[in-house]
Amino acid sequence: NERTLSANDPAFTLRTLGRLQGDLSGRITYTYNPGFVFGVVPGRALAPGEFGQLLYQVEGCTKRVSRVLDDGSVEERSRSWMVYCDADTGEYLQEFHNPYTDETIVVPAVRGGPSVSRLTLNGPILPASLGLESTLLDTPPRLHWRVLGERVWISRYAASRISVANSKPRNELSMDAWVCHLSDLLDEQATHIPSTYTWTSHADWQSWLQMQDHPGSLLWRVESVVMHEKEQLPSRLLAQLERVAPGQINLPLP
């Protein structure tokens, strides 16, 4: 089965990414993105519960339209939203008590925004305003494949640096992983590949945590699924987005 995957063909890899992340027919998709964010402080001989601890949960979604351009690249137009939730209860946060600084701080109401990007045979093309350096850029797309019977595990990793005005650069090592059916992957007529998706990221502290020079970093774990109807998203998330970003989910994509 591995031989039929064209695993070393950048064009097959590119189309696979487009079909996993969205629907190449041009149909709108909604990716539901719930997850957990941990604080990790290594090298200080801390007790297990202090070395690593769950800080908060996140919940969000990405509305996306994908299409194949004449040159074979995939254009993705999207808008994303992410909100923060209590580590234990999952209730949406307005304030957060930082266990490292012992300060109570205001939580951003919502994160995210619009984006237009392109997947190409020489890596993704992203808006220059992102200030992003990444090992994914300027290189053919590559995925790692494992096949066992009808199951396929697909993964990739990237190291990145995001530079934002008036703040220090933020470094990140991220790992993407999809699990899908081999028959869906090999179906050349299918414009979308159903899968479960996991994003794991080891990254610097978020600026709103006000960590200053406190040692340590964040470990993100987000598990996602792509759907075709807005109504398939959790009703509580839709209600929260209407509170913090009224009407945005119904706006046309950029």
Residue map of PLM features:
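Intrinsically disordered, low-complexity regions enriched in small/polar residues
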Residues: 14, 32-34, 38-40, 58, ...
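A eukaryote-biased signal for long
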Residues: 138-254
